[in-house]
Regions:
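N-terminal helix-turn-helix DNA-binding core of bacterial DNA-binding proteins
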Residues: 6, 12-39, 58
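Alpha-helical residues within the helix-turn-helix
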Residues: 35, 52-53
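Short, hydrophobic-biased segments on the C-terminal half of alpha helices
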Residues: 48-49
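Beta-hairpin "wing" of winged helix-turn-helix
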Residues: 55-69
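Conserved segment of winged-helix/HTH DNA-binding domains
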Residues: 73-98, 109, 113-118
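C-terminal regulatory/oligomerization modules of transcriptional regulators
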Residues: 98-160
Length: 160
């Protein structure tokens, strides 16, 4: 079953929360975000530290400090957040650095699974945090046009 880890899910929620902060407004604390979404604070604090170390967030020290996005939300993809927390997305062992399994020589599903893997990566790379925080539209990089973020739209991108 393909599934985001809880850490990646919480990371996306936190980054989306920060993207929804008005303007270049105040920083949001880990506690504020954890309380807003019912996320365990110690776990969220570790996730936010990881996102800070990878350059997606920066921390603001002080009593009114917290975390802010290091880049504009339209410049951060869902894939970047997931990768920062969990590392590369690996659908099967044949997509690891070693790329070998017991069935490598006789495998009949490697190529179809590679296509699925690439489609997932491509889609996650195209979904920005801005889109996640906004009106549910998918902004197409080629044209800049916004289209409804629907099943039909995903099918037209050849990812469903």
């Amino acid at each position: 079953m393909l599934k985001l880890t809880k850490k990646a899910d919480y990371g996306l929620i936190a980054v989306r929360h920060l993207a929804a902060m008005p303007g270049n407004g105040r920083a949001a604390s880990a506690k504020e975000i954890a309380d807003a979404y019912g996320i365990p604070l110690p776990l969220l604090a570790k996730i936010l530290q990881k996102l800070t170390k990878t350059g997606l967030l920066f921390s603001v020290p002080g009593s009114s400090g917290g975390y802010k996005l290091a880049r504009r939300p339209e410049k951060i993809s869902a894939l970047e957040v997931i990768h920062a927390i969990d590392g590369p997305i690996i659908l099967t062992t044949c997509f690891t650095a070693h790329g070998h399994c017991d069935q490598s020589e006789k495998c009949t599903v490697r190529e179809p699974l590679r296509k699925v893997h690439e489609a997932i990566i491509h889609l996650l790379d195209r979904i920005t945090i801005s889109e996640m925080a906004g009106d549910g539209s998918l902004c197409l990089p080629e044209t800049g046009a916004k289209t409804p973020f629907t099943t039909e739209r995903l099918e037209s991108l050849h990812v469903l």
